[in-house]
């Protein structure tokens, strides 16, 4: 099946072949031949300059997010989470489940964070730390990371950012973002299998983590930084994925070109917008100016049901060789209960090419027009 979901994502054949490269010892000199270029290319892809060290954490994006909370929020501090969707809520739940003094500032699904509302909350709550989502996978909304971080710092708080579903598909200019830590993963726009959470850790974050207690072991950023500076992981990594990551990042940086990759994602967002304009009764869910370049959410006409999308459209497209995303389950269930219109999601991240997207959109349109 060709995956047009929002993760995991399509993996190129040559990246799959890289899995056949020889295994190696993660404490052996051979390890450096993989991890040094991996870290160098991650820094280039992030535009991180010399302000961040990328650390690879065994797990997924939520692993790095939990490490950010456990290592950067002291027991006597407060954390405000800003949510524009399901994965923003997850960041809050991570903090709450770890016993942090957390509050969740929620915005309506399909909307970006309102900085004026955020500033009002910052004035009243005076949190020590603020976490938020750069790109909300459940809704296709992208927040203005730089503006949010600037506002958060204006009020004396430390910004923690979840960039799981946008990193590798957009220019995040991390060096000038203001983020204390930027959390992402392998299985989205990097077009690799799941297996690593990636944390871009600033000196500021490292210094604070050294003062915070009760960090656990695998969520202790100071331990990860110690190994990252040696071009290693804290515990034994999936060396097959490391080989693929080494190959893929080199290909992105030195073959495709970073800016070309970013431009391709912008082009595909525009393709979806144009496609939606040609469908009767469908519209983009996210507001213009805050639409993700890696995935799109599309509002269906009134009367379309979850059952039609999951049992009808999705299964019809499966028969044609595509895995369709009928929308984020919890969100669509809530929308249906409230009598609101359903949304579908279209993943166009990583190594999905424009010609692949055209073919999929044509097939998807045929099925949607039957509703």
Model-derived regions: residue spans:
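Active-site C-terminal subdomain of aminotransferase-like
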Residues: 10-11, 187-275, 287, 352
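Conserved active-site segment immediately N-terminal to the catalytic lysine
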Residues: 175-187
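Conserved N-terminal alpha-helix of the aminotransferase class I/II PLP-enzyme fold
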Residues: 18-64, 86, 90-94
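Conserved PLP-anchoring active-site segment centered on the Schiff-base-forming lysine
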Residues: 73-89
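Active-site phosphate-binding strand-loop segment of PLP-dependent enzymes
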Residues: 113-168, 181
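N-terminal "arm"/small-domain region of PLP-dependent enzymes with the aminotransferase-like
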Residues: 1-29
